[in-house]
Amino acid sequence: NGLDIAVDGMDEVDAELNAVKGLGGALTREKIVAMAARQFVLIGDHTKEVDDLLTTVPLPVEVLQFGAERTQQLLSNLECRPVLRTNDDGTPFVTDNGNIIYDCHFEFAPDFESLDAFLDITPGVVEHGLFLGFADDAFSFLQQTLRLTNLHRNGGAHLVQQLDEFIFIH
């Protein structure tokens, strides 16, 4: 019947709590979990908060290995530079699903709704790291401060609570 709550890390998040995730390579499974949860919470340090998505990190795009070169060409049409993610030894990084990832580097922030729609219909694309409208809350850390940022779908995010002392257990 789904999950009550899912908490996951973020690679970037904007004021509307749209996020980029997947730099660890598990973006498809992360999105499935986020969709299954009644409440989805992002967590990360304050450097993950950005004015515009895709300004500090690339967009991970999980791609089938079959036909990957053609899919890479299609991704290039997005005015980005898709780079095959590799391991330290130079071999392609393979996801838990057996796919590869292209990290798409954008020079300018794209229209995210259009990008999301395009990637959803692009042959060979399994999933992408844009999490638009998924998050309900985001926790961010600033040195020894915990800030709870809450989603306002019509007006961005605002500070709900700030704790100057807390214990972080990992």
Where are these regions (language model features)?
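Hydrophobic, low-acid, alpha-helix-prone terminal segments
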Residues: 145, 152, 156-167
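Conserved phosphate- and dinucleotide-binding cores of soluble alpha/beta proteins
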Residues: 1-142, 147
